[in-house]
Amino acid sequence: MTVVIGLTGGIASGKSTVSQMFRELSIPVIDADIIAREVVERGKPAYNKIVEVFGTEVLQEDGELDRPKLGSVVFYNEEKRLQLNKIVHPAVREEMNRQKEMYIKEGMQAVVLDIPLLFESKLTSLVDRILVVAVKPHTQLERLMKRNNFLEEEATARIQSQMPLEEKVKNADEVINNDGTIMGTKTQLQVILKKWNIID
């Protein structure tokens, strides 16, 4: 039986570090962010719908989607954000499911669905176990400011636009505390995977 793990966390909590650790253990990772980029490539059904709803001003000169521009359009406009989600989410869900089924058919021990907005997008039904990568609020803020060159105000707004991390922690099957060293994170992951009988 393939165990389907939903990997999530707050923005800048270090989820991609954990995602990489799964890959190093030869456990396949299906990345929602990569799929979200692929489903809106020029000519795909979701791309055509976005142009229909948002107009050509969200396109680059070469006709590809201008993601930062679209991002700023929806970030401060709830109605438009919901419209965009209605287009993108079903396409992402369908592709993630397709890849997941493929790995299950191959008889993989486990497969990871790396979904930043697992709870917000109501995708928990796609997975068997939920693993949340968590950090203390000040660590999250510092990392986000450093990583994205954000001012404190901007970083705080991004963090607050997601479900609070402590809420995600409450709904998790297991939690990795990512405030410490890489080695510490790796050890926590191994303990969890042994508990779930995924590794020996």
Swiss-Prot record:
<comment type="similarity">
    <text>Belongs to the CoaE family.</text>
</comment>
<keyword id="KW-0067">ATP-binding</keyword>
<keyword id="KW-0547">Nucleotide-binding</keyword>
<protein>
    <recommendedName>
        <fullName>Dephospho-CoA kinase</fullName>
        <ecNumber>2.7.1.24</ecNumber>
    </recommendedName>
</protein>
<keyword id="KW-0808">Transferase</keyword>
<dbReference type="GO" id="GO:0005524">
    <property type="term" value="F:ATP binding"/>
</dbReference>
<dbReference type="GO" id="GO:0004140">
    <property type="term" value="F:dephospho-CoA kinase activity"/>
</dbReference>
<dbReference type="InterPro" id="IPR027417">
    <property type="entry name" value="P-loop_NTPase"/>
</dbReference>
<comment type="pathway">
    <text>Cofactor biosynthesis; coenzyme A biosynthesis; CoA from (R)-pantothenate: step 5/5.</text>
</comment>
<dbReference type="Pfam" id="PF01121">
    <property type="entry name" value="CoaE"/>
</dbReference>
<dbReference type="InterPro" id="IPR001977">
    <property type="entry name" value="Depp_CoAkinase"/>
</dbReference>
<dbReference type="GO" id="GO:0015937">
    <property type="term" value="P:coenzyme A biosynthetic process"/>
</dbReference>
<keyword id="KW-0963">Cytoplasm</keyword>
<feature type="domain" description="DPCK">
    <location>
        <begin position="4"/>
        <end position="200"/>
    </location>
</feature>
<feature type="binding site">
    <location>
        <begin position="12"/>
        <end position="17"/>
    </location>
    <ligand>
        <name>ATP</name>
    </ligand>
</feature>
<dbReference type="GO" id="GO:0005737">
    <property type="term" value="C:cytoplasm"/>
</dbReference>
<keyword id="KW-0418">Kinase</keyword>
<keyword id="KW-0173">Coenzyme A biosynthesis</keyword>
<comment type="function">
    <text>Catalyzes the phosphorylation of the 3'-hydroxyl group of dephosphocoenzyme A to form coenzyme A.</text>
</comment>
